[in-house]
Amino acid sequence: MDILKLLSRGTKKTQKGSQNAFNPQQKLPSAGTSTNPQLYHDQVRGHKRKRTKNESEPEAKVDLPEVDFFAPKPEPVAEAPVEVDEPVQAPKPTRSSRLLSEDECRQLLRSHRLKITLLSKTEDQSKVKKSKKKKKAAVEVKKDSKKQLFPQPLDSFGELRNAYGLSDKVADNLVFQGYRVPTEVQMGSLPLLVHPQAALKDEDGLDGGVDFLAIAPTGSGKTISFLIPAINNILRRRSEENTGNIHELEAVIVAPTRELVHQIVSEGQKLCKGTGLKVVSMKKHTHLSADQVDMAEDSSEDEEDKESESEDDDKKPSDDKPKQITTPDILVTTPFLLFKFLTSGPPSTQKVLPTVRDLILDEADVLLDPLFRDATMADWTACTNTNLRVSFWSATMGSNIESMVTEKLTSRAQSLDITPKPFVRLVVGLKDTAVPNIAHKLIYTASEQGKLLALRQLLHPTASDDSGPPLRPPFLVFTQTIDRATALHEELQYDIPLEAGGAARIAALHSGLTDSARSSIMRKFRAGDIWILITTDVLARGVDFAGVNGVVNYDVPGSSAGYVHRAGRTGRAGREGGIAVTFYTKEDIPFVKMVANVIAVSEKQAGKTGDEAGVQKWLLDALPNVRKADRKKLKERGNEARRSGVKSKISSKSGYERRRENNRLGAIEGSKKRKLQANDDSGDDGEWGGIDD
């Protein structure tokens, strides 16, 4: 017996700095690929809860015999050895050799929190019903019927070749890239999109495919989920029609940012290796093979306008240089680049893309927001093929976006006089929630100076700080505006010592930089040369950084969806150990409850309660609710307190020091102007040359 342990058992051992000390066994996203990229795998009952009438009652428990501890030991009796033929082990049946029953599909999908729904058409029918008490006509609105589907889930990527007819080249590329276990969104979407007849044998009308909407967490492999069916559909059509190596545009992928476009192109080229397909990103001067359609109305005013415009065109010099036409099989573009090309022809005309059969909207909720909506809808309308399949992918999707998509699909089918395809929705987990495999922290900093101090404490953690696990680089810092990102970069660029790389370890990326500068910064950050990347919401969506250990929201995001996408830059593909830190000041208190609610729901999914939770219940009760008008204003403009005023400046200098620096810079500028003016005056005072004859 240890007498010291016995005497000290009533004391609490202080673990000062033990949480923040470097732990070599601590899991981090930068440590490597997770063995299991799946987020959910719940235990689901395999039998019915209620017993049927014909089912016999369970057998009563049989009492075990009593043990006599003082009985004599029985003598061992020698038994003759019995020869037993060893059974030959039969090969284990693979998932591809048999189809699961509907009950088995339901259990497997439910264990991974997959909900697949067949969205019905919107019906405006209303039923008039008379009330007996008030004797007034009460209108009862008929709700849309939504049928839940239970397709065959994907157990491994090897099933795509055997059970769903995936191309051998694409299957080999998947093996080469290391894809083994599918994530939840891949488990539910790939069978439906690659071979819907095999995934849903009991459903009709699947010969032309389905229109698809997927809502899945960030980092769950949505890019692979829509690239594989698009590539396989093109290869299948080529083999059926025997078109050979003829290239024509058959799939268009629309993404909101250039960085996401380049990432999709890179992943697509890896999957298309050896197939002969071309995946190209659209640029400003890209010209595609398209048909010209006259959009003008037959009116005299339009004819007069055309005549006047044609006269003006005759006066202008004509450009007879032939334009080189790009012929990709899959085009990845931003909405405005494609819209600019489609409307680049003569007035009152528009180009259309009749050969496109797959239209994919990545981050569909932001593409259908007011900022991109007109361009996205015009791109969609330009795809005039009657066999067009449309799919929508995002981690967040509002009900207004879903209804808009449903109405567009219905109106397009009516205008082209075709039968609409089945519209299927896949939801993984809970809608509009952050990934459950990362930690969330809300830190109150009171002011802008407090934010800067808190960020420097994250850069240089001390052993006495026991506020949780430390945030280790590489990590992202999100700000509200470009000016704030630039100012924060100037303030922090010398905080890393020269021995560790100095100012080269910190960079800022935003839409104000050139394409080459943005590509260079992205390349250095992926290579590990840059440790801290300060950016705006331009990197909040879709961009995959596998080894990012954390995210710092220096400014509170403008919406709950914005927080979900920002926090989703870490914890990709099931990696654990990521941290999402959010700073908020006194000016952010009216809006921060949106973020707190998302954190609370995410931690509830992860099973964190009590002290483990990043947001306590008392904080949720104390924070004010965000009004609808404030929520809309915050989403469009952000926090107005960050846009102007002395309090919004990111600087550690005092007001007196800033005034002195501004006065000094003003004096230097004035001195330069006076020197230039003096030089101009001296040039005018030269020798007089007389009057010319």
Curated annotation (Swiss-Prot):
It is an enzyme of class 3 (hydrolase). Residues 454-623 form the Helicase C-terminal domain. Residues 16-38 have a biased composition (Polar residues). Residues 53-64, 313-323 have a biased composition (Basic and acidic residues). One of its GO terms (cellular component) is nucleolus. Residues 294-312, 681-693 have a biased composition (Acidic residues). It comes from the Eukaryota. SUPFAM superfamilies: P-loop containing nucleoside triphosphate hydrolases. It catalyses: ATP + H2O = ADP + phosphate + H(+). Gene3D superfamilies: P-loop containing nucleotide triphosphate hydrolases. A motif (DEAD box) lies at residues 362-365. A motif (Q motif) lies at residues 159-187. GO terms for molecular function: ATP binding; ATP hydrolysis activity; RNA binding; RNA helicase activity. The Q motif is unique to and characteristic of the DEAD box family of RNA helicases and controls ATP binding and hydrolysis. ATP-dependent RNA helicase involved in 40S ribosomal subunit biogenesis. Required for the processing and cleavage of 35S pre-rRNA at sites A0, A1, and A2, leading to mature 18S rRNA. Belongs to the DEAD box helicase family. DDX52/ROK1 subfamily. Interacts with the U3 snoRNA and is associated with the 90S and 40S pre-ribosomes. This is ATP-dependent RNA helicase ROK1. The gene is ROK1.
